[in-house]
């Protein structure tokens, strides 16, 4: 049976709409183990915003929590509007069975701390910790705040049990600050007051009932104003104000063992001040530390970076009614993955045109080559294991582009009876489309470099009418061993024509699969200086620009090699789309080794048969939905 509390609260929200925050419920049976009511679950609060790394660090942190604890978690995620949907998609797709979460709109509370002068890099996100007793609902008694740069090495429930040690006056639990900052030994800094070394606010245990009763909301503001008159601003953000408050109200703090916030910042003296074995590592510095023990602890952090998050919560395949005995079942890709949309970058303003693509680590160099040529926005989904995706994230960050948005899609473990995991190409395309903040999207694959006159492609895109797409001719080297310097082709149609006439370049797949791109009619393209229309032919699969709001999603049952683009273009034809060709732009294929799925297609007749069957089913279903009779 589900807990009466959960059911009652769910019904209250359903029928009265009185919940003050959005919630996703994942009901799980669990046994009451605690000494007071909150101990049958652990309630945690996070502030997630600012730099994209915050989301990646949150996932890294929560992996460490899940690794050592199977308790039930209730997370309170305090985010701004930009981050809420991304974190929601991460948590929903991760599908952790022993966790439910609630969102609180940080934007609504920003003004309550914006008046505080602050020179700390955390900006108002750090100061917002002061508002947690105001943000969290009045029906909640205890909660622990966590910075996302903390890695646990123990069961977090052991820390949660520290609430048992609070006396009647204690409202906060914190670890001592493991540096000399608040001692101000050199006397040169305008340091806020603190008890001794002060306390670090990376982890704060809040007794919310007592805080509300004691008038925290007004008292901390009085303290802040008092010391702002002296110091002018905060140097350590919220930590200065918390410590000044504790200085004035010393009976309200309980000191937590230092092992639960072993600080690794640039100024810390954790090794000499904390002899205990570290249980929670706090990487609380923008700069890498050069301490002797930092490298050792950084390896622990990197291990959680590389840890497969799916190992912490394995999920069932999302296919319903599939039978393991069906020979075609093993050729279907998974279609349920852990996702972080906008993991790197975000298109805050709608763009006119952006490239939409997808890739995995083995095609990273191709993406970098493509991105160097395409100077417009890019929305791309990236697929791989946790370690692979973080390596890719670092490489893309080094491009120093603000118009590239990366959506991370984490590879899932396959079932024992399945063949190798199929690359979920259409799932990835759909992710990249969904999160592209663009009016028009150029659908391409990452092993193509799009070249030509970008000014005219924007103009041609703007002239598209309803149910028209703009095809970008796809070309390739005639001989795979040829290596042409693509930088020479950036806007040189004349050079391309020269190579076409010399037969060193040809239409993509012209000899081995002519129906795929030959209908683009490259002979006409050579002579044209304006867009021209081409007829759809069977198995045509061009790359094209389309209005995003008109673009149907790709069928996610097609993964790896085989019919994944053909079926999408076929659907456009059934919807009466017209295919116009850009006379000024083109794309050139970057050679690469054959993928695993292509090799499988070539050697496995069952694979080919199953995908042909799936293609026919797709055609019939699409035709039926559109009211078309197939010939």
Swiss-Prot record:
Q: Which organism is it from?
A: Caenorhabditis elegans
* Segments in the Cytoplasmic topological domain: 1-6
Report keywords, A-Z: Glycoprotein, Glycosyltransferase, Golgi apparatus, Membrane, Signal-anchor, Transferase, Transmembrane, Transmembrane helix
Q: Name one GO biological process term.
A: protein O-linked mannosylation
Its EC number is: 2.4.-.-
- List the carbohydrate attachment sites: 95, 105, 167, 177, 287, 400, 485, 502, 521, 529, 593
Q: GO MF terms on file?
A: glucuronosyltransferase activity; xylosyltransferase activity
**Lumenal topological segments:** 28-631
**Record membrane topology:** Single-pass type II membrane protein
Q: Where does this protein reside within or beyond the cell?
A: Golgi apparatus membrane
Enumerate the PANTHER family for this protein.
Answer: GLYCOSYLTRANSFERASE-LIKE PROTEIN LARGE (PTHR12270:SF25), GLYCOSYLTRANSFERASE-RELATED (PTHR12270)
Similarity-based family: Belongs to the glycosyltransferase 8 family.
| Protein purpose | Probable glycosyltransferase.
Please name the gene that encodes this protein: lge-1
Q: Does the keyword Secreted apply?
A: no
The protein's predominant localisation is: Golgi
Q: What class of enzyme is it?
A: transferase
Its name, as the record gives it, is Glycosyltransferase-like protein LARGE
InterPro entries tied to this protein: Glyco_trans_8 (IPR002495), Nucleotide-diphossugar_trans (IPR029044), Xyl/GlcA_transferase (IPR051292)
Regions that span the bilayer: 7-27
Q: Which GO terms describe its cellular component?
A: Golgi apparatus; Golgi membrane
